Amino acid sequence: MTTLNPYFGEFGGMYVPQILVPALKQLEDAFVSAQLDPEFQAAFQDLLKNYAGRPTALTLCQNLTKGTKTKLYLKREDLLHGGAHKTNQVLGQALLAKRMGKTEIIAETGAGQHGVASALACALLGLKCRIYMGAKDIERQSPNVFRMRLMGAEVIPVHSGSSTLKDACNEALRDWSGTYETAHYMLGTAAGPHPYPTIVREFQRMIGEETKAQILEKEGRLPDAVLACVGGGSNAIGMFADFIDEPDVGLIGVEPAGLGIETGQHGAPLKHGKVGIYFGMKSPMMQTSDGQIEESYSISAGLDFPSVGPQHAYLNSIGRADYVSITDDEALDAFKTLSCKEGIIPALESSHALAHALKMIKADPDKEQILVVNLSGRGDKDIFTVHDILKARGEI
């Protein structure tokens, strides 16, 4: 029996080999007790403030909205130590691992940001670190691979399947099945088997909590909508969590449309997938007609995932959040626009959310509205990818 509800409506659950059930139950028990332990909370808050650099800024875009009546704010998770929102929850999970007496961390990574965050947390807290990463992602995210190794992590290339994030997830789970007595699996997003979606949400919810306090201070009211990109969905659920019970605030999640939904080369299972069982949970996913997991695609490695966190599936099913999609080209345009107009280079993942916000502004420039985009990470890791694309197009 679980202590916390493992489901969000019909989505979620704990679909894992029996051998892993005790490890997940131990994790749930440790999390529940840690949430009630003032010492644990004080240690977590201290790391967030003095190591990671929280609270992060809420920045008004001075130039992007000129000539319109929109106020566009960016929640600056790109300013966090490690370069993205991933640092928040790995610090929490690393403290949990120590609490459970674990000595090793297993992690998976796509863009490399969760890998970097896992590596820095392990270096700080004296834990061994093994990171599984698709061989294709290792090629396109070489700066982050070097960062991980520099901080003492072992990076293990995964050549099976599509050599991307879903395959790294499978290998990490396989490793954990044989090592769970000494190792903690530090899952990088708000997906997977219970209790991970709940743990990751709670260790990311300060994004929305800070945003709410900051926007009330700056504007005296809540925003009309908050936007975030959605791969597995951790940065988005971190932003949404504190606004779910605010009915006047729109929640907009932005999935990757890749080369276009009609091409099949995308990563948008919420709107264009079917419900199934994958990665230990019941959630929408990209499937072939005979039920096999289909390969996802996105220019951004961190969104290149064929499923999505179960709470997003639930919010979509009850109509509380809207989920849209943005193509590679639209994300690239937003990447360039923010860089040129505001002097902020966003991650390609975050550029998807920004692109949709810019679409909303362009569609009705005279609408008075306040929008907040969760700028989930910085774009340093993507400059070589973008450089090669722009060079091939003759744009540079």
UniProtKB/Swiss-Prot annotation:
It is an enzyme of class 4 (lyase). The modification N6-(pyridoxal phosphate)lysine is found at K86. SUPFAM superfamilies: Tryptophan synthase beta subunit-like PLP-dependent enzymes. InterPro entries: Trp_synth_b_CS, Trp_synth_beta, Trp_synth_beta/beta-like, TrpB-like_PALP, TrpB-like_PALP_sf. GO terms for molecular function: tryptophan synthase activity. Keywords: Amino-acid biosynthesis, Aromatic amino acid biosynthesis, Lyase, Pyridoxal phosphate, Tryptophan biosynthesis. GO terms for biological process: L-tryptophan biosynthetic process. It comes from the Bacteria. Its EC number is 4.2.1.20. PANTHER family: TRYPTOPHAN SYNTHASE, TRYPTOPHAN SYNTHASE-RELATED. Belongs to the TrpB family. Tetramer of two alpha and two beta chains. The beta subunit is responsible for the synthesis of L-tryptophan from indole and L-serine. This is Tryptophan synthase beta chain. The gene is trpB.
